[in-house]
Amino acid sequence: MAALFPPPPGPRFVLRGTQSAVNTLHFCPPSQAAGNPLLFSGSQNGLVHIWSLQTRRIVTTLNGHGGQGVIWLKTLPQGHQLLSQGRDLRLCLWDLEEGRNTIMDSVQLDSVGFCRGSILVRGQQCWMLAVPGKGSDEVQILEMPSKTSVCTLKPEADARPGMPMCLGLWQTNSSLRPLLLAGYEDGSVTLWDISERKVCSQITCHEEPVMGLDFDSQKAKGISGSAGKVLAVWSLDDQQSLQVKKTHELTNPGIAEVTIRPDHKILATAGWDHRIRVFHWRTMKPLAVLAFHSAPVYCVAFAADGLLAAGSKDQRISIWSLYPCP
């Protein structure tokens, strides 16, 4: 019998050459790409590769983490600057202006875990940084680039959520108060008010550690994935209270990352089962299961134009053009 639905298309193209598992991906914003779309990848071998999506080749390799895995990459809005977080307990700030590839500054970190940092831009030249703290359950908040400590967020003694596994800094359109969403080892998601140094709300939506989360501030709705089989969708009401809205059970356990496309139409997950899954964000209707990689998928990222990139333990980066942005 013929299949009812045609299989999803293969990747638009594949990037090879990292020679190591790909832990994290980040598209360069169009405003900084100068007509040459770029993708940043961070690998298990401690290298950051800058790829041209036109030539599909590595343009530059950054080596600043002493062979220790790179787990997070983020560009800053003020010019050609890139943040890279490595398991060498260092967060590097790179100057990429006019072809340079030098480390401008670095922050010494206290946690060697796999929790990626998060930033919140506070002005043209300053931004807030959230990273795992010295205590196993702590999150440290810094004002950058001065590295001034804002606070340390530590759960109540009887809470015991375990280590923070993923972080998301944000603020509402109506308020300049910085907020932090943190996913923890015990399967909980917590909303912190940074100014008050207090927990606004906390929900337990997973039985396993929360491995990734993303938040749509326009809809006041977020999603989290874990080491288990469940994707959880939760919302935030006007009283800053988190509520689980729905859950979606996957075939196989293990979500390494979940990310919502910039236009808030679809989302993608990186699966330990080698699969990339794509969902409609409003309804959570499954749209595609992309079976290309031969090992766990560790990261997914969207470009501003909707292009999807996925990185895997198989050392390949797949680039997909699905449901183009209108």
Curated annotation (Swiss-Prot):
InterPro entries: G-protein_beta_WD-40_rep, WD40/YVTN_repeat-like_dom_sf, WD40_repeat_dom_sf, WD40_rpt
Entry keyword annotation includes NAD: no
Observed phenotype of the null mutant: Gnb1l deficiency causes lethality during early embryogenesis.
Mapped WD repeat ranges: 17-61, 64-104, 159-202, 205-244, 250-291, 292-325
Subcellular location(s) of the protein: Cytoplasm; Nucleus
Keywords, sorted A to Z: Cytoplasm, DNA damage, Nucleus, Repeat, WD repeat
One family name in Pfam for this protein: WD40
Main location: cytoplasm
Keyword Cytoplasm applies: yes
One GO cellular component, as annotated: cytoplasm
Disulfide bond residue pairs: none
Tissue expression summary: Expressed at low levels in most tissues and highly expressed in adult testis. Widely expressed in adult brain with striking regional distribution in forebrain, midbrain, and hindbrain structures, including the thalamus, hypothalamus, amygdala, hippocampus, pons.
An example Gene Ontology biological process: DNA damage checkpoint signaling
Function according to Swiss-Prot or TrEMBL: Acts as a critical regulator of DNA damage response (DDR) signaling via specifically regulating phosphatidylinositol 3-kinase-related protein kinase (PIKK) family proteins.
Protein name, UniProt field: Guanine nucleotide-binding protein subunit beta-like protein 1
Lineage of the organism: Eukaryota, Metazoa, Chordata, Craniata, Vertebrata
